[in-house]
């Protein structure tokens, strides 16, 4: 594990793990941003994920810490199907809410399939009348749901209703909704959208344009 990736705390979740990086060295969570890893063929390599979140093209974790944001990275203990991965994200959101000092709204960030799963997890919590206290959700280059996944989304209202919804689509990536910068923003299910001028970073979770856009829209 790289020295700068060592978390201040680790939370054991059912089917997953969260690495916790409080801002400014304060050993408590006050203003959290949850960043969700994509499920893979085996356990999440959270060390590698931490490298990507704080990658050379845009060190998002460092930038968040500079703004006083506490970062929680969420991964999975093993290969995770839709239901298992979604439950890990649900528990991570609820644990963060319970461990947070104060009442600052949280943010959730997911890329690729993680964006789709986080979207479903938040909508499902709302459908169950469970408070997640997430003020903003950011979907980065989300995968398109399969027919079965879309059916699951539809059963919980398709989108979370309480957070402000942000969508980032990198250049050269198919937009989740099939939209682009010339389309009417009102045709999107998201409140804000960035159609980035550059491609997705190969070394970082976001490129500079995407990272700056995200930071300016945090609650």
Question: Each predicted region: which residue ranges?
Answer:
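Short, surface-exposed "cap/lid" segments of acyl-processing enzymes
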Residues: 7-76
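Structural recognition of the beta-strand scaffold that forms the well-ordered cores
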Residues: 32-36, 70-75, 105-109, 136-139, ...
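Extended, composition-driven regions rather than compact fold-specific motifs
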Residues: 1-15, 30-31, 66, 70, ...
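Well-ordered mid-protein domain cores that form the structural environment of catalytic cofactors
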Residues: 64-94, 98, 106
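A Trp-anchored, charged/polar loop motif used as the substrate-binding/catalytic surface
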Residues: 14-22, 152-158, 218
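C-terminal catalytic-base region of ester-bond hydrolases, centering on the histidine
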Residues: 154-219
């Amino acid at each position: 594990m790289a020295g700068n990736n060592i978390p201040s705390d680790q939370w054991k979740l059912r089917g997953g793990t969260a690495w916790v990086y409080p801002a400014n060295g304060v050993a408590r969570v006050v203003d959290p941003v949850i960043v969700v890893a994509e499920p893979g063929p085996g356990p999440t390599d959270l060390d590698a994920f931490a490298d990507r979140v704080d990658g050379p093209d845009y060190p998002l974790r460092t930038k968040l810490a500079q703004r006083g944001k506490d970062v929680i990275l969420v991964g999975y203990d093993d290969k995770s199907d839709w239901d298992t991965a979604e439950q890990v994200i649900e528990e991570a959101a609820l644990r963060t809410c319970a461990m947070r000092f104060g009442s600052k709204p949280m943010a959730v960030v997911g890329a690729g399939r993680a964006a789709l799963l986080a979207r479903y997890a938040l909508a499902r919590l709302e459908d169950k009348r469970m408070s997640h206290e997430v003020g903003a959700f950011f979907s980065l280059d989300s995968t398109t749901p399969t027919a079965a996944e879309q059916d699951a989304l539809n059963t919980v209202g398709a989108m979370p209703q309480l957070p402000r919804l942000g969508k980032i689509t990198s250049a050269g990536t198919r937009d989740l909704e099939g939209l682009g910068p010339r389309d009417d923003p009102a045709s999107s299910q998201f409140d804000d959208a960035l159609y980035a001028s550059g491609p997705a970073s190969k070394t970082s979770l976001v490129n500079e344009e995407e990272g700056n856009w995200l930071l300016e829209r945090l609650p």
